[in-house]
């Protein structure tokens, strides 16, 4: 009888021990990966993993009080992490031991479906700095990890009540061309400035730009841009220019460009924003208009430009058409930017493509015919976003460096959604991406120095 009791007791003890082991969540696998920004260690389990962390010197220990495990070691060779070991600590316990080569920031967090415990060890020093620049204007710098890559971002948030207004300006000074964004921002006393529209090497603006209701650059390709209808109403919308000149003989000419170099069979509209003169050669015909009446005609090229006048400069077939005009002729000009909102906007700057619409990622690179070097790949970026409450976001991210990989357009859109953007548009990026605060460049341009640009966007006093 005593023998039977002893056997039953032993069986009961064995069952209790098995139940205790079964209650411990088994860790199925230890795995690791290395990216530019971090080393990631993952513990896979069929059950949620409880943990308690402790760091002493260069050793991070993660106690797993209810997780059983077999001894495992990650196959890692990294400048930041020396070794990663999963160590059994009795039947119901185990420990994750991470030995570091240098002091690093880290983050530990559980995930579900499937159950995992993730340990991220960062190669770089994560940092956030925030500064109040003016009433309603905040600047935030971040060194962070985004999608497993390092990222440096520079964000200016402008609340609707701020006594500042966003306006375009020429980085070249008074006229069209290329120049130092930082120099112009300092000379104009701007609190904040960023680069904006695309341009060619001669400073030809590729896009539509309007300031104080006056159009100073145009592009026929429909592309997204920022529109300011008044001090309080701002939107992001498609913009596409079309314009005509109606000749007295009934011929209607299509205006193909504004304030840019004249090319073959072209018809370009110039105003005094461009330069003191049209800078054209003698192989064409130019007509100066005031109040839509012809006041001067020239075949010599390089016609002067004065405020209140417009010059039509034609080459080839368009030069031949302009030959029918005489002094005093009435030549009505029409132009539209494709919508009533764009036509009545006081301020307008196009870039492209659209990034965010109704709070969702909506990258329209193909629809807006963006060049492959813009549409593809990871690069420094400049963007503008609008939040539901009217807050304006000016964002620059660095790229092409060890501390910041840059973003794809899709990632840029995701980042802006994360910031709360309801709508957003991309501007010129790469080596052009630049943010200036109080006359000082705060980001790190990827060329290693400031690139001269054409159009900037700055915060002007209302």
Outline where the language-model segments fall:
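Repetitive helical segments and hydrophobic/amphipathic motifs
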Residues: 13-14
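Gly/Ser/Thr/Pro-rich low-complexity, intrinsically disordered segments
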Residues: 23-50, 55-61, 74-462
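N-terminal signal peptide c-region/cleavage motif recognized by signal peptidases
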Residues: 17-19
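Sec-exported N-terminal periplasmic low-complexity segments
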Residues: 65-70
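Bacterial N-terminal signal peptides that target proteins for export
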Residues: 1-10
């Amino acid at each position: 009888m005593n023998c039977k009791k002893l056997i039953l007791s032993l069986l009961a003890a064995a069952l209790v021990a098995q139940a205790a082991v079964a209650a411990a969540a088994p860790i199925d696998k230890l795995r690791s990966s290395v990216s530019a920004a971090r080393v990631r260690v993952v513990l896979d389990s069929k059950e949620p993993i409880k943990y308690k962390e402790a760091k002493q010197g260069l050793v991070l220990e993660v106690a797993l009080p209810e997780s059983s495990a077999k001894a495992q070691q990650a196959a890692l060779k990294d400048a930041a992490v020396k070794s990663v070991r999963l160590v059994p600590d009795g039947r119901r316990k185990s420990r994750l031991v991470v030995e570091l080569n240098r002091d690093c920031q880290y983050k530990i967090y559980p995930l579900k479906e499937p159950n995992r415990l993730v340990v991220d060890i960062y190669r770089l020093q994560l940092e956030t700095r925030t500064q109040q620049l003016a009433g309603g204007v905040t600047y935030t710098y971040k060194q962070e990890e985004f999608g497993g890559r390092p990222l440096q971002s520079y964000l200016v948030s402008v609340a609707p009540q701020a006594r500042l207004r966003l306006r375009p300006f020429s980085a070249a000074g008074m006229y069209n061309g290329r120049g130092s964004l930082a120099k112009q921002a300092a000379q104009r006393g701007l609190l904040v400035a960023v680069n904006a529209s695309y341009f060619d090497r001669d400073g030809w603006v590729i896009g539509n730009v309007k300031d104080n209701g006056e159009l100073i650059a145009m592009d026929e390709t429909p592309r997204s841009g920022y529109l300011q209808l008044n001090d309080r109403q701002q939107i992001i919308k498609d913009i596409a220019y079309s314009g005509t000149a109606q000749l007295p003989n009934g011929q209607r000419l299509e205006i193909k460009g504004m304030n840019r170099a004249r090319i073959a069979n072209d018809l370009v509209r110039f105003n005094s924003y461009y330069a003191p003169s049209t800078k054209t050669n003698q192989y064409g015909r130019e007509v100066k208009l005031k109040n839509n009446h012809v006041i001067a005609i020239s075949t010599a090229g390089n016609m002067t430009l004065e405020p209140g006048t417009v010059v039509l400069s034609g080459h080839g077939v368009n030069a031949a058409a302009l030959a029918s005009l005489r002094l005093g002729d009435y030549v009505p000009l029409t132009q539209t930017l494709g919508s009533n909102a764009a036509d009545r906007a006081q301020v307008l700057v196009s870039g492209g493509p659209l990034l965010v619409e109704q709070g969702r990622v909506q990258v329209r690179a193909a629809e807006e015919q963006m060049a492959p070097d813009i549409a593809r790949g990871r690069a420094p970026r400049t963007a503008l976003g609008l939040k539901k409450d009217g807050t304006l976001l000016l964002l620059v991210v660095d790229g092409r460096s060890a501390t910041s990989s840059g973003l794809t357009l899709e990632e840029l859109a995701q980042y802006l959604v994360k910031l709360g953007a309801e709508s957003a548009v991309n501007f010129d990026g790469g080596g052009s991406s630049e943010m200036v605060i109080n006359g000082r460049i705060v980001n790190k341009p990827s060329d290693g120095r400031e690139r001269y640009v054409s159009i900037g966007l700055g915060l002007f006093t209302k």
